[in-house]
């Protein structure tokens, strides 16, 4: 193929937008416990802000319970404080160096808030995909202007970039719909 776009790089960047969205929505709380729920929480430990999973083992022993086994006994208070201050509605129970976090039932208002947040995450992912498309299209226009590719080849590659964008946005929308059903399920 003549010069134009590196479609492997474009594909990698589109996949990155989807992966980032998956990571974002994984941290949204549904009715079930998940170790990912604590991903956004950082603990002040050893003079730095660290994710909970770097100072403790996070597990899910029961469907509505998260267990956090802190490795360093002196950090139990800091982990407890970080979880309480994260405003996720968690109330840890300290048992030695382990924190047990029962997940309360989600009320309808909180479920709707979580759906709104999921929609915001999806919009950020769509915008990221559109930025990738814009970069690709600008590269094509420059290549065509510089005479590296023909007008026909630019049109073909442009259509391919648009198709990749549409597929990425469709994948994001599908993931959003699945997460929405999961959140609203009582």
From Swiss-Prot:
Family, per entry: Belongs to the RRF family.
Domain of life: Bacteria
Protein name: Ribosome-recycling factor
Function according to Swiss-Prot or TrEMBL: Responsible for the release of ribosomes from messenger RNA at the termination of protein biosynthesis. May increase the efficiency of translation by recycling ribosomes from one round of translation to another.
Keywords, comma-separated and alphabetical: Cytoplasm, Protein biosynthesis
UniProt keyword annotation of Nucleus present: no
Pfam families registered for this protein in UniProt: RRF
